[in-house]
Amino acid sequence: MRGMGNMNNMMKQMQKMQKDMAKAQEELKELSVEGTAGGGMVKVVVSGHKEVLDVIIAEDVVDPDDVDMLQDLVLAAINDAMKQADQLVNDKMGRFTQGMNLPGF
C-alpha cells in the first residue's frame, strides 16, 4: 500500500499545479504589453491572452498619399506586440511546462 501514498501525493501536486496554472492564466488576462513601430509613431497594446486592446497612431504618420507606409507600421507594431506577448506568456507559464517538451509552450 506504500504506492498509494505516492499516488495521493502526485494527485495533490497535479491539483495544485492546475490551480496555479489557472491563476497564472487569469493574471495574464490582466497584463498587457505595448509594441511600437516608426519610433513610437504607431503603438499597439496587446493583452497576455494576445488580444489587441488598443491601436494608437500619431497624427504625423497619417498621410492619405502614403497609406502603404501606415499599413506597414501598424503591421510592424502588431508583430512587435505579439512577440512581447509571447515572451510574457513564456515567462508566466514556462515554469509549468519546464522539461515536458510540449509543442507550443
UniProtKB/Swiss-Prot annotation:
SUPFAM superfamilies: YbaB-like. Residues 17-26 have a biased composition (Basic and acidic residues). One of its GO terms (cellular component) is cytosol. Residues 1-26 are annotated as: Disordered. It comes from the Bacteria. It is found in: Cytoplasm, Nucleoid. Pfam families: YbaB_DNA_bd. Gene3D superfamilies: Nucleoid-associated protein YbaB-like domain. One of its GO terms (molecular function) is DNA binding. Residues 1-16 have a biased composition (Low complexity). Keywords: Cytoplasm, DNA-binding. Binds to DNA and alters its conformation. May be involved in regulation of gene expression, nucleoid organization and DNA protection. HAMAP family: DNA_YbaB_EbfC (MF_00274). Belongs to the YbaB/EbfC family. Homodimer. This is Nucleoid-associated protein EAT1b_1710. It comes from Exiguobacterium sp. (strain ATCC BAA-1283 / AT1b).
